[in-house]
Amino acid sequence: MAESVYKIIELVGTSTESWEKAAAVAVERAGGTLRDLRIAEVEKLDLHVENGKVMQYRAKIKLSFKYEEAD
């Protein structure tokens, strides 16, 4: 088996629908520019509240992807 290295970044996704959607938004957006995504770990869930109402669900995630050196 070949040796591999993975980079881990932190992202915050937001949604007006749910925490699950917020996490998915973060992963999907990252997938638009990063390749070989591997594992997303939810670090923190919180809410943006205004006037006693939930405005946004927020999910802070750690996302790993395979590190490849430039040629």
What are these regions (language model features)?
Residues 6, 37-40, 54-60:
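Short connector loops at helix/strand junctions that flank enzyme active sites
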Residues 1-2, 71:
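Basic/polar N-terminal segments that are highly enriched at the extreme N-terminus
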Residues 40-48:
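Short, conserved loop-to-beta-strand elements that form functional interface hotspots
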Residues 51-71:
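C-terminal structural segments of small proteins and small subunits
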Residues 4-37:
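Short, well-ordered alpha-helical segments
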Residues 13-15, 44, 61, 65-67:
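Flexible glycine-/small-residue-rich
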